[in-house]
Design a protein with these regions (language model features):
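Extracellular adhesion/carbohydrate-binding repeat motifs centered on closely spaced tryptophans
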Residues: 1-213
Length: 213
């Protein structure tokens, strides 16, 4: 078997590179090269929607790029600051080698991130904190500093939660056509998902909110 299939926490890596299980408390693995910090929209570059007709019919198919003022497109991780409808935010975004912005689940090296699918003016931004996934219906925790997905026991807000550190069966599959991960509706627990109202592999019971008492 390809090592990316074995090691990617139950999800194959569809864009090359070596997958990984992550693990521990989810410390940062984000800065792996190709990063651009502190870009101001309107000064250092501007957004461009490359497929407006398709995106109007299906917003999730939107293909955004960030054109740099000095030429070319942003690639890899980029920290963008801009204002939308009176709200100013600064956050990390990731762009593929062709400059198209990534969204949804994203694997960088051995670390998983979630890039917003919310069309609220900040589509594609790195999500931090608790994330309830609309596809598999499960909860995940993304580090509030690095955005890296947590696995195993994590102390969050003074409480302990258990986030699945293994995935014996693949549950998410990469769609090369859309460049996005999709849940395969497999009867197996996804990597990183929170245990709820059950006993963890090491014998501790967590309640319906995932909290160990």
């Amino acid at each position: 078997l390809n090592d990316a299939v074995v090691d990617a926490g139950g999800r194959t890596h569809g864009r090359g590179g070596r997958g990984g299980s992550g693990g521990g408390s989810g410390s940062s693995g984000r800065k792996t090269g190709g990063q651009t910090a502190g870009l101001r929209v309107g000064l250092d570059g501007n957004w461009e929607l490359t497929n407006p007709v398709e995106a109007t019919a299906n917003p999730d198919s939107s293909k955004w790029v960030f054109n740099l003022a000095n030429g070319g497109r942003a690639k890899g991780w980029a920290y963008l600051s801009y204002t939308y409808e009176g709200k100013t935010k600064s956050e990390w975004y990731h762009f593929a080698e062709d400059g198209i912005m990534d969204s949804g689940w994203f694997l960088d090296g051995s670390t998983w991130y979630y890039l917003s699918m919310n069309h609220n003016g900040f589509y594609g931004e790195m999500v931090k904190g608790w994330h309830h996934d609309g596809q598999d219906g499960r909860w995940y925790y993304l580090d509030p500093s690095s955005g890296a997905m947590h696995t195993n026991w994590s102390k969050i807000g003074g409480e302990y939660y258990f986030l699945n550190p293994t995935a014996p069966a693949q549950t998410w599959f990469f769609d090369n056509a859309t460049g996005r991960w999709n849940f395969g509706d497999i009867n197996s627990r996804p990597y990183g998902s929170m245990y709820q109202n059950e006993t963890t592999p090491d014998g501790y019971h967590v309640n319906e909110s995932g909290v160990w008492r």
